């Protein structure tokens, strides 16, 4: 299996999710030094091996990188982080400028004696792209850690920073207690086996408690809902209609993963083009109304999940139905 965290992609691309600003970070902790966390250590080994394999010339200061990463992992989750943008700017300038120039110069040196030589990564293992510029090494190491930390933080993985850092540091020093293959196996087991089972059990227990709440009803499919505002009962959508809504989506721990309110813009979509829980649930409320939906995973994103929504995760949505556009007709208006 290809690396679970492909570090070049972690560096240059943001995690695809719609996390909303100012939310507490409850998944990353410093951890217990006396009790090893194998998942965190495996992620560290995976990250360290990815950096070294993909960019052997990038001789980072691992301590500075790790400290910058840890600082970000322990901060709250925000939609737009200015520190991330500052780090991105520094990294893009370095990778598109000095790094390319120095790599090209090294390649020219290696090929001077044989222009037909095919260069491979091993040719750059002993090459230091910073060329002794310690100020630049410090700046890029910290920027790399900052940018990577913000992205990993958005994943909300249950990691301990002490063991994550230790995995990176020990792999970089050729002292890791597990190899890349075992690290990937541990990560794969978490995503494919442990996390789906954990989410399924926790979601089932959560929905059972929600069902006991006042005003909550349950459909035959297992969808839980509460009508917060009835709206116009004469103008309810069908599955074939298009609706205009505002909404807020939460995970079972209250984490807001998506919100049209946060973006400041309502959204329109055909009701038969979304998850089953939405298709069924919005037909229960009238135009101008508001409904809260608790959606079991089989009516949501199922065993695959989506972005911040894990496999077998139940969801909560608060939805305001602003308008109903009948299939093949103009928007319905009411006085």
Task: Show the residue positions of the predicted features.
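Bacterial N-terminal signal peptides that target proteins for export
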Residues: 1-9
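C-terminal motif of bacterial Sec signal peptides marking the signal peptidase cleavage site
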Residues: 15-19
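Cross-family detector of peptidyl-prolyl cis-trans isomerase
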Residues: 20-335
């Amino acid at each position: 299996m290809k690396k679970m965290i492909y570090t070049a992609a972690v560096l240059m691309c943001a995690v695809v999710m719609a996390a909303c600003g100012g939310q507490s970070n409850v998944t990353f902790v410093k951890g217990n030094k006396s009790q090893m966390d194998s998942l965190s250590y495996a992620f560290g080994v995976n990250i360290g091996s990815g950096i070294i394999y993909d960019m052997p010339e990038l001789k980072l200061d691992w301590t500075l990188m790790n400290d910058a990463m840890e600082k970000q992992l322990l901060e709250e989750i925000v939609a737009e982080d200015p520190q991330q943008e500052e780090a991105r700017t520094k990294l893009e300038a370095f990778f598109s400028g000095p790094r390319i120039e120095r790599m090209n110069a090294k390649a020219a040196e290696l090929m001077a004696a044989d222009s037909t030589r095919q260069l491979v990564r091993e040719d750059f293992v002993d090459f230091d792209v910073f060329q002794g510029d310690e100020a630049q090494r410090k700046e890029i190491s910290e920027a790399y850690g900052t940018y990577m930390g913000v992205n990993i933080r958005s994943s909300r993985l249950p990691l301990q920073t002490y063991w994550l850092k230790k995995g990176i540091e020990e792999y970089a020093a050729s002292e890791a207690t597990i190899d890349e293959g075992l690290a990937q196996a541990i990560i794969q087991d978490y995503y494919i086996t442990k996390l789906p089972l954990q989410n399924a059990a926790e979601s089932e227990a959560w929905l059972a408690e929600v069902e006991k709440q006042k005003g909550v009803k349950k459909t035959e499919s297992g969808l839980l809902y509460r009508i917060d505002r009835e709206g116009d009962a004469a103008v309810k959508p069908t599955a074939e209609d298009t609706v205009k809504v505002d909404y807020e989506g939460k995970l079972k721990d209250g984490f807001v993963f998506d919100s049209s309110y946060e973006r400041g813009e309502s959204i329109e979509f055909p009701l038969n083009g979304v998850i089953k829980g939405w298709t069924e649930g919005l037909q229960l409320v009238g135009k101008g109304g508001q409904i809260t939906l608790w959606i079991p995973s089989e009516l949501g994103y199922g065993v695959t999940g989506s972005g911040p929504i894990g496999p077998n995760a139940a969801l909560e949505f608060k939805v305001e139905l602003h308008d109903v556009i009948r299939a093949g007709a103009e928007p319905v208006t009411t006085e």
